[in-house]
Design a protein with these regions (language model features):
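Single-pass membrane-anchoring alpha-helices
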Residues: 1-28
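Parallel beta-helix/beta-solenoid repeats that form elongated, surface-exposed shafts/blades used
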Residues: 27-196
Length: 197
């Protein structure tokens, strides 16, 4: 008859308990708890970096290694988000400006700004639309709307005058006023047509 000694039984039980505890054969799993790391880099199977988190920001990349998204903190302490196109050029910006106001900017595939929606230097809201060369074509803000031609000359102004009355002004191609429709200084309605020949 074979005799199994007590030491072998204890070792067998301990190894079984160790395996069960290591592989987590429990009804509930434990959380990692408080995990502290300086940064996290995410790579695909080929070793191409697909994402990075650390130093106050997060950045993602496409399969070619070009940046696609940046979320982080700027030098002034404000937060911002930048989106990039497939070539790695910035296409959109959402964040905090130098003076603390928020804004959104979009860019074309040449890297030129095409629109701006946000707080201006005068702390009022504004919307600006740019042409493909980056020149202002439309402006809406602080109680008025302006439009510009391809030479940068104002063509339309719609807004409020210093006396509080509304008015519309149109301008010819060289920036000279051609029509005025609005409220005069005496609160009367006025229509003026100018001969700029």
């Amino acid at each position: 008859m074979k005799v199994i000694d007590i030491k072998s039984i204890i070792i067998g039980v301990l190894i079984t308990l160790l395996i069960l505890s290591v592989y987590g054969f429990r009804p509930e799993t434990d959380e990692l708890g408080h995990l502290v790391v300086k940064s996290i880099t995410i790579e695909d199977d080929r070793g191409v970096v697909m994402g990075y988190m650390g130093n106050g920001y997060m950045q993602t990349y496409n399969t070619f290694g070009e940046p696609t998204l940046f979320v982080g903190t700027g030098k002034d302490g404000g937060g911002y988000l930048r989106a990039y196109n497939g070539e790695g050029d910035e296409s959109a910006y959402v964040g905090t400006g130098r003076m603390g106001g928020g804004y959104i900017r979009t860019y074309n595939n040449s890297g030129r700004e095409t629109s701006y929606l946000g707080t201006g230097s005068d702390n009022s809201g504004q919307l600006r639309i740019y042409d493909k060369q980056g020149e202002t074509r439309s402006y809406l803000g602080d109680g008025y709307l302006q439009s510009y031609n391809q030479f940068g000359e104002r063509t339309i102004f719609l807004g409020t005058g210093t006396n509080g009355g509304g008015y519309l002004r149109t301008y010819n191609f060289s920036g000279q006023e051609s029509i005025y429709i609005g409220t005069g200084a005496d609160s009367s309605g006025q229509i003026r047509v100018y001969d700029n020949s």
